[in-house]
Regions:
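Beta-rich, blade/repeat-based domains predominating
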Residues: 130-141, 172-184, 215-228, 259-274, ...
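The canonical Cys-X-X-Cys-His
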Residues: 51-61, 95, 99
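Short loop/turn segments that connect beta-strands within beta-propeller blades
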Residues: 159-163, 201-205, 245-249, 290-294, ...
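Conserved beta-strand positions in repeat-built beta-propeller and related beta-rich domains
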Residues: 145-151, 187-193, 231-237, 276-282, ...
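C-terminal capping alpha-helices of c-type cytochrome domains
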Residues: 83-111, 143, 408
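Electrostatic cytochrome c docking/interface patches
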Residues: 24-49
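Beta-strand-rich domains and repeat architectures in extracellular enzymes and scaffolds
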Residues: 123-154
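Blade-level signature of beta-propeller repeat domains, shared across WD40, Kelch, NHL, RCC1
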Residues: 394-429
């Protein structure tokens, strides 16, 4: 398999993996081995184009059992072209038209908007490369907004003051996922498709790569520095947790109990800044690692169906998480293991995804509503407030505060856009 075809096959798998739960579970179209691509397609002028170009490395399951809006289909074709699909403009337009007509969007939960005292302003920027699928955003102290261009295989940056954007192509297969900056301003990422951790020297534009010492650690996910400058990271499907010493380049990998099936995912530190806490995507657990002994302690969450995408930590060292499987927002007490849950505004199918904490308020996005909804929860009053994301959101997979504490950086993967949600002063109009 060529490098390009391998990349396309990984993309196809990831596209199917992030379909809404109802689309994954309630499969309507059954395989048919007699059909090109393994699944039947409706008749249409571009049917053969789809069969010829969308089955190079995978079958058509991701298409026939998907749930996409016209805008989603447009961006899907852009992403595939960005990754190297061999189709010209005319063919791409024909494929988009066929997919939109043949596979209309199915019903999704409607976002519930709750009024409240906080006012926000949404700003957004498109990535220079169409179909880049920015996975994670990063707001740096100098005011820049960075993103991981997963399908474009680059790291990008925009200046919110001027709108000027720049992309830094990664010279090897990377599929960048999570991003974090160090004290010198370098940008580090998890090479989700390249089994490495990468570092971009912003001053020179040069990359340095740290390959995983075990080939099973194929998909580094979320990186985060501790207070001592050690980079910790999760390896989702490989089932590892890892840490990298930037001074020596040494990487230590270890399997938490039950991995790889549990799939380590989100990663956070409490106020001590040394002991990492992480969630599993494959089970209903939160775990922590003793940084001195590497002993892992796990906490089983009350609902066996709980699945966590992202987490946030408030100043009282409470861990908050959105339960992707049931639409709830929950608080986890690391000292006792106690959990308290709140029903999210848009209900059990809303699929909370990106999450962060700003001034001890929890902000997250309901990713399965159309459009996506931005939600704010005040732990003091135990009240929600929510807004529609004007551009639609396109699944906001991660978010973080801006350096001044007055905004939230977001990535809108399905739209190939990044944005900042400005939290306005209380006296603003």
């Amino acid at each position: 398999m060529t490098r390009k075809s391998l990349l396309l096959s990984v993309i196809a798998a990831s596209l199917y993996a992030v379909l809404p739960a109802n689309a994954q579970q309630n499969v309507v179209v059954q395989p048919d081995a007699s059909q090109p691509g393994g699944f039947p397609l409706p008749d249409g002028s571009a049917k053969k184009l789809v069969q010829d170009n969308c089955t190079v490395c995978h079958n058509l399951r991701n298409i026939v059992n998907s749930n996409k809006s016209p805008q989603d289909w447009q961006e899907t074709v852009n992403m595939m072209r960005s990754a190297g699909a061999p189709i010209n403009d005319e063919q791409a337009n024909a494929i988009r038209t066929y997919l939109i007509a043949s596979f209309p969007e199915k019903a999704r939960p409607k976002p519930v908007v709750i009024d409240g005292p906080v006012k926000v302003k949404f700003r957004e920027w498109a990535t220079p490369t169409p179909g880049a699928r920015p996975h994670d955003p990063l707001a740096t102290p100098d005011g820049m907004l960075w993103w991981s261009g997963q399908f474009a295989n680059n790291i990008g940056r925009v200046d919110p003051k001027t709108g000027e954007a720049k992309e830094y192509p990664i010279p090897i297969k990377g599929g960048p996922h999570g991003l974090i900056d160090d004290k010198d301003g370098n940008i580090w990422y998890g090479g989700n498709w390249g089994a490495h951790i990468g570092k971009l020297d912003v001053k020179t534009g040069e990359y340095k790569f740290y390959p995983m010492p075990d080939p099973k650690a194929r998909d580094p996910h979320t990186p985060l520095f501790d207070k001592d400058g050690i980079l910790w990271f999760s390896v989702q499907n490989g089932g590892f947790m890892g840490r990298l010493d930037p001074k020596t380049g040494e990487i230590k990998l270890f399997h938490p109990a039950g991995a790889p099936g549990q799939m380590p995912y989100a990663l956070r530190f409490l106020s001590d800044g040394r002991q990492p806490w992480f969630s599993y995507w494959g089970s209903n657990k939160i775990a922590t690692i003793n940084p001195d002994t590497l002993e892992v302690k796990e906490f089983v969450l009350p609902d066996s169906k709980t699945r966590i995408r992202r987490m946030g930590v408030t100043s009282d060292d409470m861990i908050w998480y959105g339960d992707w499987s049931n639409g709830k927002l929950s608080r986890f007490d690391p000292k006792t293991g106690a959990v308290k849950s709140y029903e999210g505004p848009s209900g059990p199918m809303s699929q909370p995804y990106g999450m962060t904490v700003v001034n001890d308020a929890i902000w997250y996005v309901e990713s399965n509503t159309r459009p996506n909804a931005l939600v704010r929860f005040d732990p003091k009053t135990e009240t929600f407030q929510s807004w529609l994301i004007p551009g639609g959101g396109g699944i906001v997979r991660h978010m973080m505060p801006t350096a001044d504490g007055h905004g939230i950086a977001i990535s809108m993967s399905g739209l190939s856009k990044v944005g900042i949600v400005e939290i306005l002063p209380s006296n603003s109009n």
